[in-house]
Design a protein with these regions (language model features):
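N-terminal nucleotide/polyanion-binding subdomain common to many enzyme families
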Residues: 1-96
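Proline-aspartate-enriched helix->loop->beta-strand connector
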Residues: 163, 167-173, 177, 193
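A short, gly/pro- and small-residue-rich
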Residues: 64-72, 181-200
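Short, flexible loop segments at boundaries between secondary-structure elements
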Residues: 148-154, 194-230
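A transmembrane-helix-recognition feature enriched in membrane-embedded lipid enzymes
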Residues: 83-86, 213-262
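Conserved beta-alpha
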Residues: 83-162, 166
């Protein structure tokens, strides 16, 4: 194996992970993630999840503070870039693509316990519609509170207090990275919620504000290309410049003595 692999135990579940640079990415399937979330809720133990794509890791490689934040979380893989990284460094892909747009609905549909859910992020209209979608599609769960992701730093104390007053089991934070992961980690001691997950644009998809890529793009791992075609100016730097940079970073890891285990 070219990459360092790890095994550890989290909430009574055996977790295998592969190192991509300084980041240990869990080699999980959806059912494993569901088991983790359920165990954390039942045991009232903290579980903070960051769903990482190539852009996430590249951003963290450029920002030591963000890197330190991610290293305090349970990291899951998202997208073809991460699959490529695993193939290059471990000689096999991750067992499943755990992008949040698919993973969160699978958790809500298949978890064995009812959840009290708080939604934080996106615009007011989008998060409200996401609440309605969850309540309609997954009626065994209760959305106990929600608010948009536009708040000032001096509102953090009251925001965390308001979240805690709803007694949630699951906090979904949709503010993009690095902001959503930074919020979770920096406010963890003030939050009385066992599970917190950064979910990116999930509320935009749930509300219908953003159209998801057609199935053919999803199956081919090319959702990023569809998004680039829809928003070329906003996403040009992320994909057209970011993808080659990520590939170069992977090659450095592969051939670096500090990143290779033989």
């Amino acid at each position: 194996m070219l990459a360092r692999d790890f095994e550890s135990e989290l909430l009574g579940c055996r977790i295998e992970a592969t190192a991509i640079g300084p980041f240990a990415i869990g080699r999980l399937r959806s059912r494993d993630a569901i088991q983790l979330v359920e165990a954390a809720v039942q045991k009232r133990q903290n579980l903070d999840i960051a769903i990482c794509n190539a852009h996430t890791l590249l951003s963290a490689m450029d920002d030591p503070r963000y890197a330190a934040t991610l290293q305090k979380m349970t990291l899951l893989n998202d997208g073809i870039g991460m699959s490529l990284a695993s193939k290059l460094l471990r000689e096999e892909p991750f067992p499943e693509n755990l992008n949040g747009t698919d993973l969160i609905p699978r958790i809500l549909a298949n978890i064995g316990i009812p959840l009290r859910i708080y939604l934080l992020g996106a615009k007011e209209e989008q998060v409200r519609l996401a609440k309605e979608h969850i309540e309609t599609a997954y009626p065994k769960h209760q959305v106990v509170g929600y608010r948009d992701g536009y708040f000032a730093s001096d509102e953090l104390d009251s925001l965390c207090q308001g979240i805690n007053e709803t007694k949630p089991d699951l906090l979904l934070v949709a503010m993009g990275n690095p902001r959503q992961e930074t919020f979770i980690v920096e406010n963890r001691s003030a939050l009385a919620v066992p599970v917190a997950i950064g979910v990116g644009a999930l509320f935009d998809f749930m509300s219908g504000a953003v159209v998801r890529a057609p199935k053919i793009f999803q199956a081919a791992g090319l959702e990023w290309l569809f998004r680039l075609l829809q928003e070329p100016r906003r996403l040009f730097r992320r994909y057209v410049i970011g993808i080659p940079r990520f590939l170069f970073a992977l090659m450095k890891i592969r051939f670096s003595r500090s990143g290779v285990s033989r």
